[in-house]
Amino acid sequence: MKRTFRLSPGAFWQVHKEAANLLANEVVGMAKAQGFDPQGQNYDLYGGVGLFSGALAAAFGLDLKITTVEASKTAAEDAKRNLVDIKGAKSVALPTERFLDELASHGKLKSNSTVIIDPPRSGAGRHVIDRLLELSPAHLIYVACDPIALSRDLKPLTEDGYKIQKISAFDLFPHTHHFETIVSLVK
């Protein structure tokens, strides 16, 4: 991915210099395999400074429609700056739970929707998963740094009809028990 990201002090970024590209490329590959619609209802939850939104724009063009949601106002401002050239990009500074509550009040997402979710180590949690089930996006890409939280969050999704299309794991912290997992789910 040929894109530069600016980060404020204290903003989250992967420690290894190649990790962000590795994860972004995998997310883009999964989106392509799912039949990602750049003009669909697309959301990048816990979107940080806009890594995955930027990667999707690099792959699908600057007309991409995507909303990046991030609780940290500083990171959301960074995302707004990092995605300024993407015509359909929005950056929302809200906790994901509150954003999804508002979004769910408008009914289900359209059939061309994709949601990328990259929660903190604790996972998305039941409230977010319940809202995603209510919104029923056609495609989900879940990026996780804790396999226990991931399995807890995947259980209700798969019980509700989501099928795991692909799972990829990355050892970004050699000689530790930590690894990143990316899961592609389709309904």
Q: Which ranges hold each PLM region?
A:
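Rossmann-like S-adenosyl-L-methionine
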Residues: M1-K187
